[in-house]
Amino acid sequence: MTNIRKTHPLMKIVNNAFIDLPAPSNISSWWNFGSLLGICLILQILTGLFLAMHYTSDTTTAFSSVAHICRDVNYGWIIRYMHANGASMFFICLFMHVGRGLYYGSYTFLETWNVGVILLFTTMATAFMGYVLPWGQMSFWGATVITNLLSAIPYIGTDLVEWIWGGFSVDKATLTRFFAFHFILPFIIAALAMVHLLFLHETGSNNPTGISSDTDKIPFHPYYTIKDILGALLLILVLMLLVLFTPDLLGDPDNYTPANPLSTPPHIKPEWYFLFAYAILRSIPNKLGGVLALVLSILILVLVPALHTSKQRSMMFRPISQCIFWILVADLLTLTWIGGQPVEHPYIIIGQLASITYFLLILVLMPVASTIENNLLKW
């Protein structure tokens, strides 16, 4: 008799994706982040669901409903902090996952890569709207500043902003719709993640060497299921260390002050995972220019496959490209630091230099390094 997991219509899909899937025998721990992102998403949806049971999306009660969750709801504090810090873990895994894709040339799977970029945008939108919901000072002013950027769009900008606000400022209507969007988007992310996997399983996984591994495949289960469980345990360990010891380490103290449209915080800044993009936005004195640079800082990922000039797929055997990659990582860390600093000398010039370097590295230096390495192969 044939095994039920290979014949049952539903079990067959699970089997082909997680059990009998042929996987390269040499994929490293950098390939763990896909499953970790799935775990983060499930965790966020579950904690978010329980938070939504007690949260009220009204400007008069939103802030106190979050305080009520933390003080009066059974284990409400742990659910709230798991959700807030879970978002940070989500973005750490996302950045690692994208970095892995860049380093090992996984972006040559075009459909998988492009769906991944859409996933990144959607996740960023979800996180931004979630940050507005507690209705603290940084929530309110963050929403005001970021939505206001759309007014830089010629001709329709102002109308577009007022349409998104549902009025003439960030108010009740804005909060209610942000809650609605924040609730629905994770399910759209889950659907997109399935499309992402669907495209990946058309080609099979890449591996550190970037060379075809068709001749040497092993089943996903038990080898990579056990490896993913180890990764998941480490993820949960780090998350719970954050939640139980320093739950507010990555947050902003200003968000413990209820939103007040009449008093602007001295330094408006987003959550840490948006700081690199925020630094790029601020480094350009022109409003429209800044908005374009902000969008392009992420959208540039779509261009990466077109800029791949190397004869080799992975950076494993390309030392010059490796150097440039790690300079890019250092540059992004610099931008993240700058995004959290006030707009004054010397931070302004450092931010501008780091922003120029970011685009220069991806658009010019990486393709040039690849071409040099191609020529070195002839020697």
From Swiss-Prot:
Binding-site list for a ubiquinone: 201
Localization, UniProt: Mitochondrion inner membrane
Binding locations of heme b b562: 83, 182
Source organism, top-level taxon: Eukaryota
Membrane topology note: Multi-pass membrane protein
Co-factor remark: Binds 2 heme b groups non-covalently.
Signal peptide segment: none
Reported function: Component of the ubiquinol-cytochrome c reductase complex (complex III or cytochrome b-c1 complex) that is part of the mitochondrial respiratory chain. The b-c1 complex mediates electron transfer from ubiquinol to cytochrome c. Contributes to the generation of a proton gradient across the mitochondrial membrane that is then used for ATP synthesis.
Family statement: Belongs to the cytochrome b family.
Name of this protein: Cytochrome b
Species this protein is from: Addax nasomaculatus (Addax)
Source organism phylogeny: Eukaryota, Metazoa, Chordata, Craniata, Vertebrata
